[in-house]
């Protein structure tokens, strides 16, 4: 069975009203996400498939979500592990090229498909495999991770996880497909959309890139168009294959991003166009009340973006 991923509109005024009781708004937002994690863990085990393929767009929180689902499965007494498709990159000097001559890391051909197919077949047949570990500092595979899901589940997460080319050598029902994305968009007093899910993901990405990857806003905004094009090309066409959906929206986060974006230092590398883009994004979040990150629990998925 496949499910349909539909957006839902939330009134900006309703968020403003709820933000008058910030602790309750945060708690409800967190509970909405964590209840889904628990439910998905139950559904995965009930389905009986050993392999779960999980995808979602950039900054949807798919990596953290994959590990939270794995933890929930483990808490139910079943072995669980997570494999990132990034570990199957073919390595420097072997990547396909973009039209401008740069390496294309988002193409399916950037992955070692032969090795990936071998791992998936081994997982399906025996429940175990030796998967590569990719070292990004030297841009090539370095080491092996032993995957053992003989009495449990392995979650494989990444950009191309729902692409049928990955599982074409397995029986059709060998893997359960899961899509993680944001469902909440926000409407103004005229019921017109004033904040889209892609805006929220961009805010998440800007903050994470700055705090953990050493990149200013110019770098993130410079890549964002390519990132979105890659999502449209490599993720959206396969979204209908999803058996399960995970909404990673946290309603109160729109109030957090207003605060965090306003406190990020200026990036002198911004072009005039990027400066206008960032100003427009900040203006969208400025329509919401400001809340501080101290509201965010230490076990929140949002900590992937703001840190501990």
Residue ranges and their predicted role:
Residues 1-39:
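Charged, amphipathic alpha-helical linker segments immediately N-terminal to NTP-binding catalytic cores
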Residues 7, 22, 27, 164-308:
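Conserved NTP phosphate-binding and transfer environment spanning the P-loop NTPase/kinase superfamily
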Residues 46-48, 117-173, 220-238, 253:
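Glycine-rich phosphate-binding loop used to anchor ATP phosphates in small-molecule kinases
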Residues 52-54:
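Hydrophobic anchor at the beta1->P-loop junction of P-loop NTPases
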Residues 62:
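Conserved lysine of the Walker
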Residues 71-81:
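Post-Walker A helix-loop "phosphate-sensing" segment adjacent to the P-loop in P-loop NTPases
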Residues 81-83, 90-139, 153:
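Conserved nucleotide-sensing/catalytic segment adjacent to the nucleotide-binding pocket
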């Amino acid at each position: 069975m496949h499910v349909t991923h539909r957006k839902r509109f939330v009134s900006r005024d309703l968020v403003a009203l709820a933000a008058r009781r910030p602790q309750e708004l945060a708690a409800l937002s967190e509970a909405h996400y964590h209840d889904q994690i628990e439910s998905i863990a139950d559904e995965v085990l009930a389905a009986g498939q050993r392999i779960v393929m999980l995808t979602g767009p950039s900054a949807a929180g798919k990596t953290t979500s994959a590990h939270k689902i794995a933890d929930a499965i483990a808490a139910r007494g079943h072995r669980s592990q997570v494999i990132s498709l990034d570990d199957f990159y073919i390595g420097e000097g072997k990547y396909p090229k973009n039209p401008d001559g740069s390496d294309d890391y988002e193409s399916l051909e950037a992955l070692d498909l032969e090795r990936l197919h071998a791992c998936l077949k081994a997982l399906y047949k025996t429940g175990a495999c030796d998967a590569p570990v990719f070292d990004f500092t030297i841009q090539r595979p370095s080491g092996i991770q032993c995957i053992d899901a003989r009495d449990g589940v392995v979650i494989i997460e990444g950009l191309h996880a729902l692409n049928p080319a990955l599982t074409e050598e397995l029986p059709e029902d060998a893997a359960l497909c899961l899509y993680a994305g944001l469902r909440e968009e926000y409407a103004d007093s005229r019921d017109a959309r004033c904040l889209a899910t892609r805006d929220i993901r961009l805010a998440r990405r800007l903050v994470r890139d700055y705090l953990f990857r050493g990149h200013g806003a110019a770098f993130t905004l410079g890549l964002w168009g390519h990132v979105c094009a890659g999502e449209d090309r490599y993720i959206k066409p396969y979204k209908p294959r999803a058996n399960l959906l995970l909404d990673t929206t946290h309603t109160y986060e729109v109030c957090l991003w207003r605060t965090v974006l306003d406190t990020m230092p200026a990036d002198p590398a911004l072009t005039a166009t990027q400066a206008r883009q960032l100003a427009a994004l900040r203006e969208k979040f400025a329509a919401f009340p400001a809340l501080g990150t101290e509201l965010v629990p230490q076990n929140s998925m949002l900590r992937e973006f703001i840190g501990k």
